[in-house]
């Protein structure tokens, strides 16, 4: 089944990734072509409306959200997912440009010092937009759960790279006691030894 987007290529550099994204044939190029779907995206991640956006009319993304490229919306959803993890650093931002060779191909540049976080957020944003534009009859994506999953993935990868136990690092970062998780199941009930 075709989705809205096809990620053609991802280039990773030290502080950003650049994804070449095809808006699949037959899919809308502009948010104005399906304003209800665009509104569904907004309801999933309402903070995108207040993102600083210098490329279009106005100062905030809400000023152009109803009439911009779908890949521009994808950029803002991705940046918001990165921001919500709390792991993207002090500034995460993006930039979207149409390809010189094909009006359906866009370069989506995401500034973030963690390539796994940026790629994971891009993949998650793609899934969320597919839901909003193509599968709104299905249950809505769990944004909070997605953010938690991305956060745990990145924390685990960082811990592993430092030679630490990823499970302990994730539990500590989330304020959980790793020892609590071992041994007892939720359904275990103490038994009186009399």
Question: Predicted segment positions?
Answer:
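Noncatalytic linker/hinge segments flanking ATPase motor cores
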Residues: 59-67, 114, 146-156
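M16 family metallopeptidases and their MPP-like homologs
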Residues: 82-129
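Short, surface-exposed linear patches
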Residues: 41-45, 129-134
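Short amphipathic alpha-helical segments that mediate assembly, nucleic-acid/protein binding
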Residues: 70, 143, 147, 166-169
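Acidic/histidine-enriched alpha-helical segments
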Residues: 53, 132-158
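Scaffold signal of the M16-like zinc-metallopeptidase fold and its non-catalytic homologs
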Residues: 73-83, 121-132, 153-194
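Generic hydrophobic/packing signal
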Residues: 68-70, 92, 96, 100-105, ...
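His/Glu-rich zincin catalytic helix
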Residues: 1-86, 175, 185-194
């Amino acid at each position: 089944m075709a989705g809205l987007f096809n990620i053609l290529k991802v280039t990773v550099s030290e502080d950003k990734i650049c994804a070449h994204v095809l808006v699949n044939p037959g899919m809308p190029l502009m948010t104005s072509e399906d304003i209800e779907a665009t509104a569904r995206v907004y309801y999933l991640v309402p903070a995108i409306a207040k993102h600083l956006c210098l490329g279009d009319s106005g100062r905030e993304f809400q000023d152009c959200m109803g009439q911009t490229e779908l890949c521009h919306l994808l950029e803002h959803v991705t940046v918001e997912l990165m921001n919500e993890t709390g792991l993207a650093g002090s500034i995460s931002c993006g930039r979207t440009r149409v390809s010189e060779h094909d009006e359906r191909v866009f370069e989506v540049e995401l500034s973030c010092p963690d390539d796994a976080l940026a790629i994971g957020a891009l993949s998650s944003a793609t899934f969320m937009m597919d839901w909003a534009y193509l599968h709104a009859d299905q249950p809505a994506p769990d944004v909070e759960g997605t953010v938690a999953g991305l956060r745990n993935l990145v924390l685990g990868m960082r811990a592993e790279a430092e030679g630490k136990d990823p499970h302990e690092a994730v539990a500590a970062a989330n304020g959980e006691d790793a020892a609590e998780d071992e041994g007892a199941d939720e359904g275990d009930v103490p038994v009186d030894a009399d």
